Amino acid sequence: REAYKALKDRILARAAQNSNHPDKSGDKNMAGQIDARLVELGIELPQAAAAVANYVPYVIDGGQVWIAGQVPFWNGAVKYTGSVGDAVSLDDAIDAARVCALNILAQAKAALGDLDRVTRIVKLGGFVNAVPGFTDYPKVINGASDLMVEIFGDKGMHARSAVGAAGLPLGVPVEIDAVIAFT
């Protein structure tokens, strides 16, 4: 519990460094401000990518949108390929996870029409293609987790898995899926 609290406090402190960011108490005035927050952070979302196989990019069920696994796809191309610890550095893997998170948000916006409808990032499932012996999967997926908290504040705190994989589609180093609650 103490480790989780320390991690949460670190992420929230980093997110709150910008004085215009809603505080970690879950400011109700956040509605209508997510696009403004993205601009404030200098973040531009990519276009939501179409599915490349026999699946859909998202499914809405009740008050949740389930986002299919997103890879580090940017400007029409895969941004990173290879295994972490070989062709991909830890820093590049963290950035790849961040790109995956941006693609998750692009899919959420396509599904919901407006990211202001998001009430909670419920869960991220992270997969890391890495060399044998690599164990820093949580550090890699923090690239996505940190971004969610930077954008959504306390609503961005989520459950998560971060696991290793012997390979991922298109040879990417990271793939992340998500469950997002909305109104």
Where are these regions (language model features)?
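Residue-level detector of alpha-helical secondary structure
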Residues: 5-8, 12
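Generic N-terminal simple sequence motifs
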Residues: 9, 18-21, 42, 53
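Short, Lys/Arg-enriched N-terminal segments with co-localized hydrophobic residues
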Residues: 17-29
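Short, polar/acidic, helix-capping and beta-turn segments at strand->helix junctions
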Residues: 30-183
